[in-house]
């Protein structure tokens, strides 16, 4: 089966797909697929994640964390034998999903302050997730030079985040009073006062 251009437009996203599905003699089906997508509504992103390569914990977290935002554009590639899908280990087969987000609202976890106005580049490559944050806001501070990674989607490994926050020092103390950190830092941070900016 071969198609150079399959177009699917929904209220949540527009897609254009190139598809080649080949049955080789005495071989499993071989898929070569590339989809370009744009004008996505991030609130409906769960319908389009590559869930076959993601652990239930990761899928659940993404489903509850992303509240709103845009997906201006991206691309998905699946290349390889369907017998090897979902390509969890390195081989001649691959699955990649790369896309941008704009003005995303992310509720990281209960008890944590949400991230707003999040612009990022998201990359699912094989069994790994990488996120390069261009900008975001927490309170009235700016999140900058930030990268996040999940080394293994199946089984799920921890989300690791490294970055910087620029803004009023008082926001750092405020963050320590949030439910997620209060037990560890609340007593120490409560009497502190701060002036000026951190960067």
Map each language-model feature to its residues.
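Extended amphipathic, helix-rich lipid-handling scaffolds
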Residues: 1-6, 30-106, 152-199
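Strand-loop-strand
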Residues: 1-11, 20-23, 107-109, 113-159, ...
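Membrane-embedded beta-strand positions in outer-membrane beta-barrel channels/transporters
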Residues: 14-18, 73-75, 119
